[in-house]
Amino acid sequence: MQIGLCLPHFGRHLETGRLLEVARRADTLGFDSIWVTDHVIVPKDVYIAYREEMLDPLAVLPWLAGVTERILLGTSVIILPYRSPLPVAKLLASVDVLSGGRLIFGAGVGWMEGEFAALGVPFKERGSLTDEALELIQKVWTTREPEIDTKRHRLHGLSASPMPLQHPRPPIWIGGASEGAYRRVARYGDGWHSTAATPEAFRQGADAVRRFWAEAGRPGAPVLSLRIPFWLDEIHRPGSDMGYLRGRPAIHGTTRQVIDALRGFAALGVTHVALDVSLTTYPAILEELDVLAREVRPALGG
């Protein structure tokens, strides 16, 4: 199992020096990936962490490319209906080039209805907007002079650049826990990026993804990944921030309990996990990274 972490580029951890230390330490310690989170403008009634200041992930991502050397750079996830897909494709392709081919593109439809209203994006059209964006992004990433007609875009006689460094393109992992999301994995993606699932919920989602993948005639198997809140009880027990969870699953406990929980997900097919460390303090994050690198990753074959 490959282990990554979600960079806490929001809330109380929003300090450049801290983000730099976390990113470079993860890179140096051998973590497999580091992930950014997407929200633009957040209603007051949603999770406490998202009401605090948050840097734009599409600004953080190229910064990460410049301050790290080997760690993979992922988006967990870019909410595609919020932005025009062609500038997003160009920016992400540029990040892939500048990082030496380290991009993982996680994409989703979004869920925060008030955020859609603020941005003037029809909430009920988010599925079709996402599908069209994925079709366009794949096309401009793999074809120098793409020819494509969609509901909202016409590309003829145009040149797309830069091409991503990865061939044929960076991996695309689709987020979400609905039938539409599972079908989207089979149609447009290379893998499923699940969020804060119980083992049983993950198993059900993974079974659906595999079924639609086979029905679509896709070769091989989809990548199965998981983003989930994490902390080590012996280092820090979150207090007031537990409101962020709102009953969502998390991986926590002793080091041995965390290893066992991750092994349980590995048995369900998870090959990549992105641990959300934002619930703990900054000193605790640094200490947890050391424990993960020293004890957890080796136990999981990392």
Label each PLM-derived region with a short phrase:
Residues 1-302:
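Active-site-adjacent structural elements that line small-molecule/cofactor binding pockets in enzymes
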